[in-house]
């Protein structure tokens, strides 16, 4: 897929930031218009993250115009907004391949470009990494500058404030740009406030401010009076007191879509000493009316027709696992006003929109705060409520200690609804749910379930909800179910699997949603297949029976083989002194790259043909 660059004459002049910095400042608004149109035309034909990038066009241009990237370090938090950055840093011709197998990475990625100083994908890491880079640059002594761009959503995470507290304490030379797209442009964001921002970021003000501090350092009462007066005057037009208390010099808010004003302010701030924070106001989806009106729906998009202004409706008739969870949540809450649903800023992705509307008093979006989400659930359980923490597998990694320390040790009945377990697809290494079974299986007191279809998912959610002896987890994949008929939720017997097919010589022990592939491979081999259902506790009796009746055992899971469900089977067989050859099939010791789920499963030999090939190769040794 290629674009006629002649339709973007100014953009054509800037294949990289060195050329961008040769442009006259007056041409930057035109460049921004063309860059925004280029982004619209490319993402509409390829799919990808959309609204965030539209809102960050002017900021991206201004940063590369003022800072000497890649000599200066530019760090993007999460990376959803970094498509314009990729277009301006030598990857313009490949932007249509983003999120595809072998294409551009969906997020800034160090292996892809020298302009990507930090590989990202998860939230709120930029300031911590940027602080480390700033300290390293200071010791290097070459004048390298560090800039971190973080959104208002990512700023809600504790890690961001931990980093700012540290930066303010050691007075590191760095700039944090707070890209605030939650609110519309306020009255404070206009010519007057832009002018004030340039004054407050100027060298004269900075020198007077620091000189005054030194002069008054021996007069604490006067120094405190001056400090309070300054805060009062700035507070009349800027909401920066919190950041000032953390040790940052706060500038803003300024209009994030006025590229020339941004350039002027950034030039003033580039050489300021100590930690600086520039607060800009932007509009998510800027320049494309449907995305401005509904930035949540247009956050990440499939291919679409820009002229229609609508997103294509899903052609599938099967419900997603996220919807299955959301519907179960509503059904259960209807009969239990003590059920509490918790999400760390993933309402839409986790299927909780309906629940949040129908049961607002039982719904808690705690923002990007996974650690808090888990311990908040622990507190609710102590108070006699029935918490359900809905969280993506890759994000649960961020709350591991809380699962152990605050929930499992205390045997609190918290249900974890773990979405996006296994291969997730196009978002690449940072978002694959590859490790949850491994890092959860070793935690005492925790029941772990892996449904093989959408109806089994409902039954397992009910099982975890009714289980009161400790925490439980139901781990399900991204995507749609198999079409299994839905029956009323009913608790399953804990730690019991089901034999799905009886064969000879070989038994496949399946954990989770690869059951259809296991059954297909088993048909060709005349193998037995067990739907194990529970990773913990294992069905010891079923494993013993299969081991005694078959020559070979195969475990199958969409999780890291190391420490996963198959490892649990191996450990049990050793404990039972049942020496049987076991092949553990799953995700090997490498990070899973981007691609469609089908492509990745085929490449990793987790489709039926691949499972058969792995098994036949193993038997032939």
From Swiss-Prot:
Gene3D superfamilies: 3.40.50.920, 3.40.50.970
Required cofactor names: Mg(2+); thiamine diphosphate
Cofactor note: Binds 1 Mg(2+) ion per subunit. Binds 1 thiamine pyrophosphate per subunit.
SUPFAM superfamilies reported for this sequence: Thiamin diphosphate-binding fold (THDP-binding) (SSF52518), TK C-terminal domain-like (SSF52922)
Superkingdom to which the source organism belongs: Bacteria
Residues reported to bind thiamine diphosphate: 80, 121-123, 153-154, 181, 288, 370
Keyword Transferase: yes
Protein's name according to its UniProt entry: 1-deoxy-D-xylulose-5-phosphate synthase
Organism: Edwardsiella ictaluri (strain 93-146)
């Amino acid at each position: 897929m290629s674009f006629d660059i002649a339709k973007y004459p100014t953009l054509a002049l800037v294949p990289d930031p060195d050329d961008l910095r040769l442009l006259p400042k007056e041409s930057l608004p035109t460049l921004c218009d063309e860059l925004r149109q280029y982004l619209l035309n490319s993402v509409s034909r390829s799919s990808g993250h959309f609204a965030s990038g539209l809102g960050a066009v002017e900021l991206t241009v201004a940063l590369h115009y003022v800072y000497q990237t890649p000599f200066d370090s530019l760090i993007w938090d999460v990376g959803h907004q970094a498509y314009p950055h990729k277009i301006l840093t030598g990857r313009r011709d490949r932007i249509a391949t983003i999120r595809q197998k072998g294409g551009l990475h969906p997020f800034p990625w160090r292996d892809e470009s020298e302009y990507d100083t930090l590989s990202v994908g998860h939230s709120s890491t930029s300031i911590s990494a940027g602080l480390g880079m700033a300290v390293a640059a200071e010791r290097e002594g070459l004048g390298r500058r560090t800039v971190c761009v973080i959104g208002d959503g990512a700023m809600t995470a504790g890690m961001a404030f931990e980093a700012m507290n540290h930066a303010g304490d050691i007075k590191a030379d760095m700039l944090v740009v707070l890209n605030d797209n939650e609110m519309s442009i306020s009255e404070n964001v206009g010519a007057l406030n832009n002018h004030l921002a340039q004054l407050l970021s100027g060298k004269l003000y900075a020198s007077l401010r620091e000189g005054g501090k030194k002069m008054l350092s021996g007069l604490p009462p006067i120094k405190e009076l001056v400090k309070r007066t300054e805060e009062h005057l700035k507070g009349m037009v800027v909401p920066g007191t919190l950041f000032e208390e953390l040790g940052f010099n706060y500038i803003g808010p300024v209009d994030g879509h006025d590229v020339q004003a941004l350039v002027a302010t950034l030039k003033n701030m580039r050489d300021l000493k100590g930690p600086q924070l520039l607060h800009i106001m932007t509009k998510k989806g800027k320049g494309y009316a449907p995305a401005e009106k509904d930035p949540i729906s247009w956050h990440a998009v499939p291919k679409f027709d820009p002229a229609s202004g609508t997103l294509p409706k899903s052609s599938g008739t099967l419900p997603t696992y996220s919807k299955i969870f959301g519907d179960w949540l509503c059904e259960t809450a209807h009969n239990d006003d003590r059920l509490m649903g918790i999400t760390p800023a993933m309402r839409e992705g986790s299927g909780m929109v309906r629940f949040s509307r129908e049961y607002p008093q039982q719904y808690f979006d705690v923002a990007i705060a996974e650690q808090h989400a888990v311990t908040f659930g622990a507190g609710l359980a102590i108070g006699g409520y029935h918490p359900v923490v809905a969280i993506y597998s890759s994000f649960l990694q961020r709350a591991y200690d809380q699962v152990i320390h605050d929930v499992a040790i205390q045997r609190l009945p918290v249900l974890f609804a773990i979405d996006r377990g296994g291969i997730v697809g196009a978002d690449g290494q940072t978002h694959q749910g590859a490790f949850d079974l491994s890092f959860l299986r070793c935690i005492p007191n925790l029941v772990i379930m892996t449904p093989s279809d959408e109806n089994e998912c409902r039954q397992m959610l009910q099982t975890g909800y009714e289980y009161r002896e400790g925490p439980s987890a139901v781990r399900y994949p991204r995507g749609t179910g198999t079409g299994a008929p839905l029956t009323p939720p009913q608790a399953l017997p804990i730690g019991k699997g089901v034999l799905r097919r009886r064969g000879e010589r070989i038994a496949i022990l399946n954990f989770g949603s690869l059951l259809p592939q296991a059954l297909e491979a088993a048909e060709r081999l005349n193998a037995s297949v067990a739907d194990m259902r529970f990773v913990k506790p294992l069905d010891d009796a079923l494993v013993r029976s299969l081991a005694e009746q078959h020559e070979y055992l195969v475990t199958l899971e969409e999780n890291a083989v190391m420490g996963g469900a198959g490892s649990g089977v191996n450990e049990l067989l050793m404990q039972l002194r049942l020496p049987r050859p076991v092949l553990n099939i799953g995700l090997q010791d490498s990070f899973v790259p981007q691609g469609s789920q089908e492509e990745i499963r085929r490449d990793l030999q987790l489709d039926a043909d691949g499972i058969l090939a792995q098994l036949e190769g193993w038997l032939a040794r």
